[in-house]
Amino acid sequence: MLRTSIATSRQVLSSPVCPKASAQWLRSSSAGRANTTTRRHYAILQEPNGALRSSSSPSVAAVSDVSQRASNSTNTKRPNTSDLNLRSAASPSTGSTLKPETVLVAPVSPPRQGQTSPGSAASAPEPTAAPPPSPPPTPPTPKTGRLRRFLLYLFLTTGLAYAGGVWYSLRSDNFYDFFTEYAPYGEDAVLYLEERDFRNRFPNATKKNNRRAVTPIDGGAQVTIPGGSGLSWKVAEEQQEGSDISKKGPHMSAVDKNKATKDTKRVEKTKGGVTSKSPAQREEAVKTKPATEGVKTQPAKVEETPREPAIPAVTTIDHLVLNTEDEPVVQDLLKVFNDIITVISADAPSSFSGPVAKAKEELEKIGKRILALKSDAQASAQKEINDAHASFDKSAAKLIRRIDEMRAEDATKFREEFEAERERIAQSYQEKINTELQRVHEVAEQRLRNELVEQAIELNRKFLSDVKNLVEHERESRLSKLAELVSSVAELERLTAGWSDVIDINLKTQQLQVAVDAVRTTLENSNVPRPFIRELAAVKKLASNDEVVSAAIDSISPVAYQRGIPSSAQLVDRFRRVASEVRKASLLPENAGITSHAASFVLSKVMLKKHGSPAGNDVESTLTRAENFLEEGNLDEAAREMNSLKGWAKLLSKDWLADVRRVLEVKQALEVIETEARLRCLQVE
């Protein structure tokens, strides 16, 4: 966004926005006098009774009231005159155009009795009779001042809006554009405030203490063209000198000509790189060309020695260039040095050309040395890296070879063991599954065969009865029972579709029973706890729409089907080990120490083991009853007996109780699923 300079804003702000108001009281006084002098007056008539009567409608009091109001409206001090006929003539300074002789003198009514006018210059003669009382003066109409108030408010509102616009223009560029474009003198006001703010923040900005002297730009020698010719005075002088062959000049001697030529060549050699002429020299060459062509009739050719330019050619110092783009330090140093050369070239390049050339040579040497050191360092580093890579490759190859050999041996061994175990397990499970599937298929096929036979018999019976009825009714009317035939066919189709649904339900129930049996077989025949996630997932998939089966599966702990559950034999074996440890801690109190543990361990060796079904709540009786329940296969009662223990005995049997609970949860879930499968079969039948 472009803004005008601050100097222009000063000039605009220094000039007044509106012309200066002139003095108002002179014009008001002259206007009052003009109104007074132009007012018409009437003669005073005397009535027969001796009273004076004025024929004019306005009374003297009204006239004085009007003059008083005119004097008050001007807000200036005027002479207190109560008599209108003694008014002084207008002075020349008031600027009035009326002459004193043309002013009409208004008659003055006689003053009231007992009233004198201290400022009057003359008094009227007293009448013979008292004048009638004059009517009371009309009260002046109060001025509302509505226009004055409106102008005052308008001026204040405009001033506040203008000041707010100037303030907001300093903070918003968009509003600045709008304000400076449409508001009068808006741009000047904003620039003035910006200048004031700049001067407040930077009071020393206008001082010239630290400013560098700026060298004026030399635009070349000024050429003055005379009014009568388009050529310069130098060329005109040379033409006059060349036109006079008799005068002494370079054409009079060939030696001088050769000398001038040699000097010219020497000067051109010393200049070296300066090959182009300045614009002033080219203009002089163009202007002198027609002058020399006009003197072809001379016996000797006139040649001028090249003049030295008025201002010597400015020779700049070339910047230093090094091919070190990948060295930031050298580039920074080169940039600083080139900046110094730029400053020297702008000021005095000839005086510093020697030191700058030496500095250039030193910097070039330094750059070459840095590049050489860098190349050597890179070569040595690359060699070390290559050696390290070679050694690492050898070590890695050896390590990989050894790891591959070990991995191959382990893989071969594990593969053989896995294949053998997988074949054995697959064979055993395949035999069991084949047996179960064969039995289930036989039962299902036999059941379906019986049901189909029953359905066929029933359908044949119905069909025969229907045919008989149709034949009987056909005798009466061949097409009378066509609707009944259609309904019978629809009923037949419905029955067929219903039996297909029954068959599907039976198949799903059989598959669910087989999946439950597979889970139970997996749990009973495993020697170690084995996860049964796959079998349980098959059960859940077959009974995806049954809420009871889903709830039973969800009641099983994830630890049970992820890690497996122990068999009954494993539970009994582990119970015996736990029972021995519980007997050792049976005599320990709750807060027992090392001595109590030792005493309990010793006394447990002496205690006699109970047999049968002993009664009592002691630890030995509880262990005996739990063992009996385990031998009978009643895990629920055994868990109840072990759960009744307290203290250290219950703490030691906590893990065993957790395993028993998981086993009971799984068995209970399987029983619920089997019951649900039987219930489905009953519902179908």
UniProtKB/Swiss-Prot annotation:
Transit peptide as recorded in UniProt: 1-42
Coiled coil feature spans: 356-379, 405-451
Skewed-composition ranges (Low complexity): 54-67, 116-127
Compartments where found: Mitochondrion inner membrane
A biological process from GO: cristae formation
One Pfam family named in its UniProt record: Mitofilin
UniProt topological domain (Mitochondrial intermembrane) ranges: 170-685
Its membrane topology: Single-pass membrane protein
Main localisation: mitochondrion
InterPro entries given in the database record: MIC60 (IPR019133)
Function of the molecule: Component of the MICOS complex, a large protein complex of the mitochondrial inner membrane that plays crucial roles in the maintenance of crista junctions, inner membrane architecture, and formation of contact sites to the outer membrane. Plays a role in keeping cristae membranes connected to the inner boundary membrane. Also promotes protein import via the mitochondrial intermembrane space assembly (MIA) pathway.
UniProt family annotation: Belongs to the MICOS complex subunit Mic60 family.
Protein's UniProt name: MICOS complex subunit MIC60
Gene of this entry: MIC60
